[in-house]
Amino acid sequence: MLKIKKLTVQYGPLPAINEISLEIKHGEIISLLGPNGAGKTTLLLTLSGILKTTEGRIIFEGEDITNLSPHQIVSRGIGHVPQGRHIFPTLSVIDNLMMGAYLHRNEKKEIKKELDSIYQLLPILKERIHQRAGTLSGGEQQMLSIGRAMMGHPKLLMLDEPSLGLAPRLMDEVFATFREMNQKGLTLFIVEQEILLSLSISERGYLLRNGRLIKEGSASTLMESRELITSLGEYPPY
């Protein structure tokens, strides 16, 4: 589905990511792990078209999408839930969701279909449809951010630190939603500091350090990996 070939991104004196190669297959949940500053967010921003590559190629479903614009990336079927959610707090839930439907803004039937699908998956959003987004709880705001990305009807959804700022109970709810999304056919690429939580729903994972890929393997292999423990110091509590 997605192949990254020797990707380098540099926007300072040193590469933020350096000759990274990885692959994501249809229907997988993949974790991208590493300490702060490893290059995880940079990789997602590059895949989203927000940052430009210095070298390397990005292939999605057989098409070279290297350095396409963000809206072109979305139109190909890649969604991105950024770190920090970035919702519009003064707008209602439905208005925030509609922000994600700009590619289908003239297709009312398609928009209704997507909304119905999102309300089925995330029923709390339907209950809060006219509520201002800024008054939602942290977990509800995360669900809204996910729902907005889903309005673009992605085939691959990338999530950057989805557990950030959430209580453990809410983390479990959010990650249970990810499992359900995956069971419905969506491929997920998750950047997450809650290592055990992320690996618990993933088939495979990749470990970055200082912009380089240093380890890849099954979730069970990574859980026992000396490289993972060394990179992060210790497993985060969960």
What are these regions (language model features)?
Residues S48:
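Helix-to-loop junction immediately C-terminal to a conserved catalytic motif
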Residues A149-M150:
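ABC ATPase C-loop
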Residues G56-E63, R76, E110-L115:
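Conserved ABC transporter NBD signature motif
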Residues L33-P35:
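The feature captures the beta-strand-to-loop junction immediately N-terminal to the Walker
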Residues G12, I30, V93-I111, L121-P123, ...:
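ABC-type ATPase nucleotide-binding domains, specifically the catalytic core motifs of the NBD
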Residues R132-L136:
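Conserved ABC ATPase signature
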Residues Q120, R204-E216, S220-Y238:
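C-terminal boundary and immediately downstream tail of ABC-type ATPase nucleotide-binding domains
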